[in-house]
Curated annotation (Swiss-Prot):
It comes from Vibrio campbellii (strain ATCC BAA-1116). Belongs to the glutaminase family. Transmembrane segments: none annotated. The keyword Lyase does not apply. This is Glutaminase. It catalyses: L-glutamine + H2O = L-glutamate + NH4(+).
Length: 306
């Protein structure tokens, strides 16, 4: 079965009672102000059709979903061995901002989707781009077809002000020799990436290349190679949902990436990209209602990579 607007609307109605059972991210004050009742879903097919329901066109802070975009950009700029000598490809099994593992493993983060790994990717981008912040914004605008995408400067400033742990992670990696640039500018770029404001429709369009062997459905142009697409989807399937990646694979069965803003993207290779948004999070930092919505959608349309 193919997704329809009615199926999406029905799914949102089914998951709405879950609102109130999760917790909006409050350690970033600007995120704590987002109404917990927001709920949206969008599907973008490889034929270029948008199917949506709920608050699918309202922009929100994508947070760690940006890590998939940053890694894609780094893969366009570096040979693979230059990236993977500095960050691993394994699930961490730890909280996304844990430092214990990083210390034990000599400053090499487990994967590019936990904070330490994403900060290494931000460092890589800083080394190759004269204006990494502008380049990432242009990348998001180009892939989504939405020229109105911006950074939420209030969120970025809020994260920088409350970002001591991320700064500690960066300095710890630098002490092990796994850092090339000044820490503060890299952190500023990292926090801005997390503060990208996009809607479910924007996100589904942006990541369409992951469902289409590396070619953006929105632009018709190659973003990465088919091999790199396979690699990205493998990392998303194993590491994309913090320490809830196994649970997500079990329930949803798609490569995905979440953010503490309540967004999740999911990929059905060869067919479609999906984005959901509900700000309340579960214990792993993933959208509670959003995960359930994706689980129901996977069941209804009979899709899974497994």
């Amino acid at each position: 079965m193919k997704p329809t607007a009615q199926i999406l609307t029905d799914i949102l109605a089914e998951v709405r009672p879950l609102i109130g059972q999760g917790k909006v991210a409050d350690y970033i004050p600007a995120l704590a102000k987002v109404p917990n009742t927001k709920l949206g879903i969008a599907v973008y097919t490889n034929e270029g059709e948008v199917i949506k329901a709920g608050d699918a066109e309202e922009s929100f802070s994508i947070q760690s979903i940006s890590k998939a975009l940053s890694l894609t950009l780094a893969m366009c700029l570096y040979k693979q061995e230059e990236i993977w000598c500095r960050v691993g490809k394994e699930p961490s099994g730890q909280a996304f901002n844990s430092m214990i593992q990083l210390e034990m493993e000599q400053g090499i983060p487990r994967n590019p989707f936990i904070n330490a790994g994403a900060i290494v990717v931000a460092d890589l981008l800083q080394s190759r781009l004269s204006a990494p912040r502008q380049r990432l914004l242009e990348f998001a605008r180009q892939l989504s077809g939405d020229t109105h995408i911006v950074y939420d400067k209030v969120v970025a400033a809020s994260e920088m002000m409350h970002g001591d742990r991320n700064a500690a992670i960066a300095y710890l990696m630098r002490s092990f020799g796994n850092f090339e640039n000044e820490v503060i500018p890299v952190l500023q770029n990292y926090f801005h990436a997390c503060a990208l404001k996009m809607s479910c429709v924007d996100l589904a369009k942006t990541f369409s290349y992951l469902a289409n062997k590396g070619t953006s459905v929105q632009t018709g142009k190659p973003v990465v190679s088919p091999t790199q697409t396979k690699q990205l989807n493998a990392l998303l399937a194993t590491c994309g949902l913090y320490d809830g990646a196994g649970e997500f694979a079990y329930r949803v069965g798609m490569p995905g990436k979440s953010g503490v803003g309540g967004g999740i993207i999911a990929v059905v290779p060869g067919e479609m990209t999906i984005a959901v948004w509900s700000p309340e999070l579960d214990a792993s930092g993933n959208s509670l209602a959003g995960t359930k919505a994706l689980e129901l959608l996977a069941e209804r349309i009979g899709r899974s990579i497994f």
